Amino acid sequence: MDPRQACLDCLAQEPPALFEAALWIAAEHLPAYSPAHALRELDELVRQIGASLDDRASASERAQGLLRRMSEQGFCEDDDFPLQPRSALLPLVLQRRQGQPLSLALVAMELARRLDIPLVGVNFPGRFLLRVPQADHLLDPATGRRLYTPDCRELLLRLQGPKSELQAAYLKQASPGEILQRLSRNLRQLHSAAGEPLAALKDAQRVIELGPVGAADHEARAGLYRQLDCPQAERYDLERALLLSDDPTEQLRLGQRLGELAPPTSRALH
């Protein structure tokens, strides 16, 4: 089965099969790893963690307990520097029990789904978070720590700088498509930093295929096409980025990049 199509098919299910879709994203880069094998690994985790949770506790307490049990099982944030793509490829995250916060959150959300714990993802800037619907706090997927509004404001300042302001949009539930886009952006960045432009291009194309994107996503793909010496494809993405941008400074920069490209070639007619 084509991994990209399998991912899209999982996303189209009702409800979407988010974790399996993320496994198919990994399969584009790790053909030797079967999504079915990773799902069996998760079955064992469900048995181990589920047996230790208190069914009488509230949803918030069970969700936090789940994250703590994951930590006891060895799951933690990957502290490699620089980070490698393996921190966002779920089969390797399950194998190593280390990953980016989003990767850990995907494992937690699937465990929660199987254990009937309501747990959703939150596209917080700079760090993916979790929440139980209607709870008055968020949860850090790597530590299980509760984050109340002042904690979220402090985290945002640390991640985004002193001029950043907490917005309601930063705290809302992320859709499955948005989560897979964020995972794909993470992989695009990690593969690019690791000097793997072809792998990064797969991720860049998937970002655009999964849903609405902005100028930055087209510009990122244009940069990969430049590395791979594909000037016509680079031109297309720069033009799309210019069309989508509403920032005058960014528009000027994109226009300069377009001007550096050789003009499109056309066949002479005879």
Swiss-Prot record:
It comes from the Bacteria. It holds the Pfam family Transglut_core2. InterPro entries: SirB1_N. Coiled coil: none annotated. Disulfide bonds: none annotated. Belongs to the UPF0162 family. PANTHER family: F-BOX ONLY PROTEIN 21 (PTHR31350:SF21), SI:DKEY-261L7.2 (PTHR31350). This is UPF0162 protein PA3419. It comes from Pseudomonas aeruginosa (strain ATCC 15692 / DSM 22644 / CIP 104116 / JCM 14847 / LMG 12228 / 1C / PRS 101 / PAO1).
